[in-house]
Structure formats: C-alpha cells, structure tokens
Amino acid sequence: MDKDYINDGSLSEKWKYRFSFYDQHGFPGFWKVSPEYKQAFKALKPRQRLTIQINFIAFFFSWIYLFVLGLWKKAIIVILLGIVAIFIGALIGVNILGLVVAAYVGVNTNKWFYEKEVKGINTWSL
C-alpha cells in the first residue's frame, strides 16, 4: 500500500527527499544500522544528514507537531510519556527526562510520518 508521494503536492521537497532516502536505503534500526544505510548516510553532506536524522521542529514542539502532521495517536502517547517523565524527574531530582522524550520524538518523527504517508501505518506504538 505504498503511496505515490513524489507527485503529492501537499508534501514539501524536504519530506520527499526524506521519503526517497528511506525507500532506497531503509530505516536506521534502534540498536543496529544496516551496512547499506550506513554507507549511504556517510555519503551525504552534513546538512543532508541532519535532514534525514532529526526533525528539529518535532524536537522543539513534540506533541503539537505530531498533531499537525496527523499523527494524533502518537501525540497522545507522547503527552502521557512526557507527564510520566516530568513526574519521575521530579521524584528523583533529574529534570533532563523531558529532553530525552523530546529528543526521541525529534529523531523518530520522520520515520513515523513516512510510515503514515507512504506505508499507510498509523499505530499507537512509538
């Protein structure tokens, strides 16, 4: 159920670039990256690497940006995860847990949006 994202006028060129990279080389794994992905990623310029690797809007606006992208299920989970992170951080005196959640969202938003737009997968899982 792959969507023709190249001819989709609602997507910016940046999203089309990310999507074509994922189509050609796959996703980075959580623990391990495939050799093909690693080689293609190393061949990119630093700015292109950042475009593929992290979504800065998602890092700074996390769940709000997920709602804007139509990833409302993941946005609800991120809100709940953020509340839990703030609560646990307050209990143990570590306030950086909110940044960890924001970083996780920033790194994974590109993949989640690709799955939604191209593959038609929109689940509750993070």
UniProtKB/Swiss-Prot annotation:
InterPro entries: DUF2628. It comes from the Bacteria. This is Uncharacterized protein YigF. It comes from Salmonella typhimurium (strain LT2 / SGSC1412 / ATCC 700720).
